[in-house]
Amino acid sequence: MLVLGIESSCDDTAAAVWDDGTVRSNVVSSQADLHEEYGGVVPELASRNHQRLIVPVVQRALAEADADARALDAIAGTYGPGLPGSLLVGLSFAKALAQGLDVPLIGVNHLEGHVYSVDLGPERPARPFLCLIVSGGHTELVHVGDDFQHDVLGRTRDDAAGEAFDKMAQLFGLGYPGGPDIDRHAESGAPTFHDFPRSRLDDFDFSFSGLKTSVLYYLRDRSDADRERLLDEHLDDLCASVRAAVVDVLVDAVRRAVEATGVGHVAVVGGVAANSALRRRMKALGDDEGVDVSVPDLAYCMDNAAMIAQAGARRLAAGHASPPTLDVHPSLQL
């Protein structure tokens, strides 16, 4: 089954070809440099650039897969959640291509794509498993059963983990996206430099707004000279301290969920799953709790179309297809 996946939910334009269990191509065109000067994604700029990039990205994905579009069995496209304008570009292209080739259209939930991205690697988790989705826009803990059976145990009540990293990086004078910059600096810093707050809720929900506010006040309540000296001399330590605060909260929630459910396999997916400390801590959690932990390769942590193509193929095999009237759902949930 040859499936073309298209992903454009935020600021990455992506296309990939999935062929019966194999990723034949996975092309991603990032707009990070374009949005860096604004400190975050500008929706209008993102959608405009998706329009410019969608055709060459799809052409490249087909070329790298050595695949003829006429041989495709289906087109899978992200229809939510995400930025409305960005979603429209990718889904409209997917709908037109499916209609032109007379093949099924499969609408894919971006979050479902992340959940099953763990199956793109060698460590495919047994079902059921717990899945921690951590990205710029979402932080959710999900119990995953058989295909398409998802039970959300908890989600963020305010900022997502990736969003918190971006905002704290901005306070530190770092670039966008901020998560990778914080992670890089943190590797050389002392996580015990400052004890920033950890919000541990009674259920499995998350909250990172308190941490973000604490960092803001920690810097704001200093003279300009003192703040400049602090950021100059202890940037690595500050990054390590905030990274530790975020990772502690995430790992603690997963540990409690493992104990509450008895599930023996955990997956960590999404852009923040690329965070080196989170990957190490989750592996350590697996050793401590006697559970298997799966984390996708870095290429599949970030937004990509391979996960969309694979999820689409999975739905097509189950007899699911979307009508040509499928519309975008920016606030779609699992």
Curated annotation (Swiss-Prot):
Binding-site residues for substrate, renumbered to this chain: I133, V134, S135, G136, G137, D166, G179, D183, N275
GO molecular function, one term: iron ion binding
Pfam families: TsaD
Major subcellular site: cytoplasm
Localization terms from the record: Cytoplasm
Keywords annotated in UniProt: Acyltransferase, Cytoplasm, Iron, Metal-binding, Transferase, tRNA processing
First-level EC class: transferase
GO biological process terms, semicolon-separated: tRNA threonylcarbamoyladenosine modification
Cofactor list: Fe(2+)
A cellular-component GO term for this protein: cytoplasm
Classification via SUPFAM superfamilies: Actin-like ATPase domain
Chain sites annotated for binding Fe cation: H110, H114, D303
Substrates-to-products reaction catalysed: L-threonylcarbamoyladenylate + adenosine(37) in tRNA = N(6)-L-threonylcarbamoyladenosine(37) in tRNA + AMP + H(+)
Cofactor: binding details: Binds 1 Fe(2+) ion per subunit.
Family: Belongs to the KAE1 / TsaD family.
General function of this protein: Required for the formation of a threonylcarbamoyl group on adenosine at position 37 (t(6)A37) in tRNAs that read codons beginning with adenine. Is involved in the transfer of the threonylcarbamoyl moiety of threonylcarbamoyl-AMP (TC-AMP) to the N6 group of A37, together with TsaE and TsaB. TsaD likely plays a direct catalytic role in this reaction.
Name this polypeptide is given: tRNA N6-adenosine threonylcarbamoyltransferase
Lineage: Bacteria, Pseudomonadati, Rhodothermota, Rhodothermia, Rhodothermales
